[in-house]
Amino acid sequence: MLMFSRFRYIFFAVALLSGPVCAGARADLSAFTRGLKTLQGHFSQEVIDTQGRVKERSNGTVALSLPNLLRWECDAPYKQLVVADGKRVWLFDPDLNQASVLLQDNEERNSPLIALIDPIQLDRKYDVSEEVAMRDGLRWLSLRPRGSTEASFQSASFGFSQTQLARMELVDNLGQRTVIAFSGWQRNPVFAVNTFRFTPGKNVDVIGDR
């Protein structure tokens, strides 16, 4: 269930793709977000502990619909599904036949999403900077919480390759690093009506804020 504790990080991507706050400051981000309403692609993720050891690897597909809909589906090594429908965030684990659910507003309030879409909060809570040198062939935009913010991370970085979002790197408050590489982006696909919905089956054990 490590991914469930990190799903809020994906709201970084949703917030960045919403555009108005950060896009004007960074040419790559501006080009990537221009005219964007929906997005679909593939991801591979590694969680690395403070000793540099890989604790978790996963890969799958991600779908976004601005401003706040998300489908994050792990295909390997284990099936797992996260759906944010605008009101709730669902995590479904088919192996356990269990679904956990949280109110999306509560999670967003405790995540950088609210700051990224609110310029006043962004300036108050975070230092946003562009890394001077390229790293791994990418141009990087970095966020770091200021002062006593309640953010659940130490730093976040977004790597761009030729105006495409290629990577996210996040360091949590325990010093663990999550690295997510993206590929195969499709811009503005038309999604089926149930893409961002989750309805638990009758025999699914549901835990949380229904």
UniProtKB/Swiss-Prot annotation:
Gene Ontology BP, a term: lipoprotein transport
Record bears the keyword Protein transport: yes
UniProt keyword list: Chaperone, Periplasm, Protein transport, Signal, Transport
Alphabetical list of InterPro entries matching this protein: LolA/LolB/LppX, OM_lipoprot_carrier_LolA-like, OM_lipoprot_carrier_LolA_Pbac
Signal peptide, first to last residue: 1-23
Localization per Swiss-Prot or TrEMBL: Periplasm
Pfam families, sorted: LolA
Cellular compartments per GO CC: outer membrane-bounded periplasmic space
Primary location group: periplasm
Summary of the function given for this chain in its UniProt record: Participates in the translocation of lipoproteins from the inner membrane to the outer membrane. Only forms a complex with a lipoprotein if the residue after the N-terminal Cys is not an aspartate (The Asp acts as a targeting signal to indicate that the lipoprotein should stay in the inner membrane).
Quaternary context: Monomer.
NCBIfam families referenced in this protein's UniProt entry, alphabetically: lolA
Family: Belongs to the LolA family.
Name of this protein: Outer-membrane lipoprotein carrier protein
Organism: Xylella fastidiosa (strain Temecula1 / ATCC 700964)
